[in-house]
Regions:
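Phosphate-binding glycine-rich loop
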Residues: 30-78, 92, 102-104, 126, ...
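Conserved active-site segment immediately N-terminal to the catalytic lysine
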Residues: 162-195
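PLP-dependent aminotransferase class I/II
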Residues: 9, 21, 38-43, 51-54, ...
Length: 215
């Protein structure tokens, strides 16, 4: 017997009445772009993560790119990402003319290793780059080591974008990633912890200025 990775048809069968009613409501009011459902969803996300601003977008890849643009990264900036992650984490960086630096992962968690991160930051400086942004990636529902990453980032004056596409809603030391990061991003691709039918993404921040830039 084959078991599908994700069975949206089965899910729809279970939620059919609610989904059909929601679609009918949208068709009735006719506000297809940034309608009331979007604002309600953003408010629910914001309340769930206890974060000031939740801004939805097309997908998780766009969320990462928009986050980097909001932080005004540029040529010769070094962006630190784990070596074990989905392609999107790396592929958005060249669009900003910055350079990705890959950080080794902890063999027990597969998340970014703090010792390797510090070593890679020092290496980037020796290569003539300016350490700019760390992008830890939550993986398999497990939050990255945000406490130690935040302490290192504060010492080095580096900003943090948390990629929570594969760990949305996870906590570490009793806190969501949004409490450690300048910006957090997520994806609503169907296979993600909070998935949609199609694709979608969101950006979270407690910084009013960053939120204004993203809007």
């Amino acid at each position: 017997m084959a078991i599908e990775f994700i069975n949206l048809k089965k899910q729809y069968d279970l939620l059919r009445k609610d989904i059909d009613r929601a679609i009918k409501n949208v068709l009735s009011h006719g506000k297809y772009i940034l309608g009331p459902e979007v604002k309600e969803f953003e408010s629910d996300l914001s309340n769930f993560l206890n974060v000031k601003h939740a801004i939805t977008c097309a997908n998780g890849t766009d969320a990462l790119l928009l986050a980097l643009m909001a932080l005004d990264v540029k040529n010769k900036d070094a962006i630190f990402i784990p070596s074990f992650t989905f392609a999107s984490t790396a592929e958005v960086i060249p669009y900003t003319n910055a350079t990705p630096f890959f950080v080794d992962c902890d063999p027990d968690t597969f998340n970014m290793d703090i010792t390797s991160l510090e070593r890679t930051i020092n290496f980037s400086r020796r290569q003539g780059f300016e350490p700019s942004v760390i992008i830890p990636v939550d993986l398999f529902g497990l939050a990255a080591d945000y406490k130690n990453i935040k302490e290192l980032a504060n010492r080095e004056n580096i900003r943090i974008i948390g990629d929570s596409a594969q760990g949305f809603g996870s906590k570490i030391h009793g806190k969501y990633s949004s409490e450690f990061c300048d910006i957090v991003t997520t994806s609503f691709f169907p296979a993600k912890p909070l998935g949609c039918y199609g694709d979608g993404g969101a950006i979270f921040t407690n910084d009013n200025n960053l939120a204004d830039d993203l809007l």
